[in-house]
Swiss-Prot record:
UniProt source species: Arabidopsis thaliana
Glycosylation sites: N92, N136, N446, N506, N549
Membrane topology label: Single-pass type II membrane protein
Composition bias, Acidic residues: 521-541, 554-566
The protein, known as: O-fucosyltransferase 16
InterPro entries: FucosylTrfase_pln, GDP-Fuc_O-FucTrfase
Cellular component aspect of the GO annotation: endosome; Golgi apparatus; Golgi cis cisterna; membrane; trans-Golgi network
Amino acid sequence: MNFHRRRYPYYNRLRRLLPLVIAVSLSLLILFAFLSFLAPPPGDSDRLPPRVRYSSNDAIKATGFHIPRAGGRSDRDIWRSRNAEFFFGCSNASSKFANSKAVTRNDRYLVIATSGGLNQQRTGIVDAVVAARILNATLVVPKLDQKSYWKDASDFSHIFDVDWFISFLSGDVRIIKQLPLKGGRTWSTSRMRVPRKCNERCYINRVLPVLLKRHAVQLNKFDYRLSNKLSDDLQKLRCRVNYHALKFTDPILTMGNELVRRMRLRSKHFIALHLRYEPDMLAFSGCYYGGGDKERRELAAIRRRWKTLHINNPEKQRRQGRCPLTPEEVGLMLRALGYGSDVHIYVASGEVYGGEESLAPLKALFPHFYSKDTIATKEELEPFSSYSSRMAALDFLVCDESDVFVTNNNGNMAKILAGRRRYLGHKPTVRPNAKKLYRLFMNKENTTWEEFSSKVRSFQRGFMGEPKEVRAGRGEFHENPSTCICEDTEAKAKAQLESRKLGKKNKSTNKDAAVTVTNDDQTEEDDPDWSEPDYEEEQSDLQDRGLYNGTSLDYDDPSTSDEPELEAMLSD
């Protein structure tokens, strides 16, 4: 009995404390739940950024930057230039342009030695015909460069149809295959060079006196030695040479046309990309592409081969638009312009710096990726593969026939093709507005794809190869042959009248204003560097110092360095 009395107070105390313990516990649980509700979610900085992954099956993704597989909506036909049907090539001589038989002097012979790659030599051949006409001289079929970096033993007749060349131009300039004999011996020529951009007066004052005295003159290293500003008849003669008289040989034409046919079998439309991304090209440009110390060491080693090559400021080069676009940047530009992953691309290029690693982003964006080596067998290419100029001619033909031609750098082949495509119908020719695009590429991961693609389309207006895109007389004539492009004003007026009848005048005007932009409407900052010399011309001038003040005689100098000619290596 006493035992139960002792336990009673203990149970009473426990019974009174239990509600208090329960109340405190519930309060703590409620407080914890309330704090959990108010706490912010884990920050973005705590998450690992998604890894950039290139795949042809999925959209390429980067932080905040999602690249679509499709080209997306576009306010233009991506396979043709607006209003191209109202413009056409016109290069016939005027009635004032006398026949060659009436002006050619029988005691004047002009020999031309070209330099550089195939397309740089092409500019020399075209200008050689005009120079002979200025001097009223007989032109000997130009000599191709066989001694420079390319070491291609091909002569004119291996690349071009020489008989067609002579016959087509017979009314303009008398052309012969070789110098005639003089007293039973080969004629001795006086060798000389002329300044860059030499005009008619320049040839009359500097070359003609030597020609009158020696009767046979050889102009060496003949590239860009004729002014861009000549009389209309001489400019039209340039066009007749470039777009009609210079025809590739039958073997080159046959193989080139077969490559085009195979591309057409794969797709109705295709893009041709001339990709200049060789190690030597990048070393010369002085640009930096983010490859770290490895890239700096490799390109610096290449630069050391040329004592005359100064080191450029990489950032300045980018700002001035002098850095070739990377393969990835070309792909992004094309996607932004409306070309989807289903588009087929033919790539004309030499050795690509970084190899497959550099090409991977472009191939991920455009998996239908071809070159002459992938659509032709080694046996088919064997007659051409040992000759760089013949291989370049095959690429030229495919690029010329492509629906859209794109370049990542404005070299000789890009310039020649741009002018040719303007003359033959203004097929789309995309030249990157590198001055504007470089900042966009650098900051792409800080923007959305929609904003990025909109800016690319805006920046590329005036750089798409459309009619009247460049003011007449601007830049290299081979790139902008404005004298040889005529407008069908009657057809254009008729089309505008029909448009008004259909009540579409305002819509048509607005669309034209949104797409067709001339350089007259662009600021100086936006204007392409048409008047600036490209890398080939700059480097040639290192070897031609002093020529602008006088014409120099050209002798073989045994002390000349054996290092490769940089201009020839970088020309195309």
